[in-house]
Amino acid sequence: MNILNLFNAMPGNIAQGIIWGIMALGVFMTYKILDFADLSVDGSFATGGAVTVILMLSGMNSGTALVVAFICGVVAGVVTGILHTTLGIPGILASILVQIALYSINLSIMEGKANTALPVDKYNLLISLRYIPKSILVSAIFAAALIALMYVYFGTAQGSAIRATGNNPAMSRAQAG
């Protein structure tokens, strides 16, 4: 193994790591605030990517494709919540079930292919590993903005109430009433 190849791969790894760090924020939020380790975030993150790529390849503009992908992620989260609250499945198990199901759903969305690429020359992409320095900068700015937004939100009265409530049913009823 050539050590130079390792160093040449670092910028691409950093760019992807920042993007996956955004997904880790979702897991962190649900676990730290709600005491609910929602691992379905991992599967819904990939589902959003699959939906976006397939819709863009079929001719939909990127903004609309992202909105549809966001809705698909919300549906995945709702399914996790229904499994947990309505069917009484423990949260960690419900999220793992949804995560595993989403891997099969992702394969179905992408017509049986493990991955599908968007041609960078044909689409105007905000982040692409072809332009790694730009990808690192854009991803870092987006991650920093998201962290700042979460910090500000959880400092508000509503955010503080969510942090205080957590997974405490008595506090939830007190907040609602």
Regions found by a protein language model. Give the residues of each.
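Membrane-interfacial amphipathic/re-entrant helices at transmembrane-helix boundaries
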Residues: 1-23, 51, 59-64
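Interfacial loop-to-helix junctions that mark the boundaries of transmembrane helices
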Residues: 4-14, 63, 88, 126-139
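Short, hydrophobic transmembrane alpha-helix segments
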Residues: 8, 28-37, 57-60
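Membrane-interface helix caps of multi-pass small-molecule transporters
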Residues: 29, 54, 58, 78, ...
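Short, non-helical or kinked segments that cap or interrupt transmembrane helices
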Residues: 30-48, 83-97, 161
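Alpha-helical transmembrane segments within multi-pass membrane transporters and channels
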Residues: 60-100, 141-144
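Transmembrane helix-bundle core of multi-pass membrane transporters
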Residues: 91, 95-156
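Membrane-helix/interface signature in polytopic inner-membrane proteins
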Residues: 148-177
